[in-house]
């Protein structure tokens, strides 16, 4: 009984405005940052390294920031209200669910083939 109640409560809190994305996809994440009494939006762009969990506790590791610092990678909850917008820039064609090997690669070696068969 209690398990069903928890599922119903968390189902209401899931975000439906997020696009479908997978590890290997290049995404642009718009994050709300609060500094004092001001709120601004900071944009991160990079490759998703992994997704973990399900439902309200689903995490995404990445994106590995291409814009600011090559070695920066972040993880956050997918359904958090701190994510203002999430855009899929490019679909990647990979054979793994966890792309940890991308952490050591730089430049052209870190490229991922584009999946042209993916539904847009």
From Swiss-Prot:
Gene: rplS
Protein name (database record): Large ribosomal subunit protein bL19
Signal peptide: none
Entry's family note: Belongs to the bacterial ribosomal protein bL19 family.
Keywords on record: Ribonucleoprotein, Ribosomal protein
Keyword Zinc: no
GO molecular function: structural constituent of ribosome
Lineage per the UniProt record: Bacteria, Bacillati, Bacillota, Bacilli, Bacillales
GO cellular component: cytosolic large ribosomal subunit
Pfam families: Ribosomal_L19
């Amino acid at each position: 009984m209690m398990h069903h109640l928890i599922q119903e409560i968390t189902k209401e809190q899931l975000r439906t405005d997020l696009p479908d994305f997978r590890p290997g996809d290049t995404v642009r994440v718009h994050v709300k940052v609060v500094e004092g009494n001001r709120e601004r939006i900071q944009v991160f762009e990079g490759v998703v390294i992994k997704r973990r969990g399900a439902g309200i506790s689903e995490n995404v590791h990445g994106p590995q920031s291409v814009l600011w610092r090559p070695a920066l990678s972040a993880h956050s909850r997918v359904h958090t209200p701190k994510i203002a917008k999430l855009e899929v820039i490019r679909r990647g064609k990979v054979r793994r669910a966890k792309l940890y090997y991308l952490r050591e690669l730089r430049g052209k070696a870190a490229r991922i083939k584009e999946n042209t068969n993916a539904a847009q």
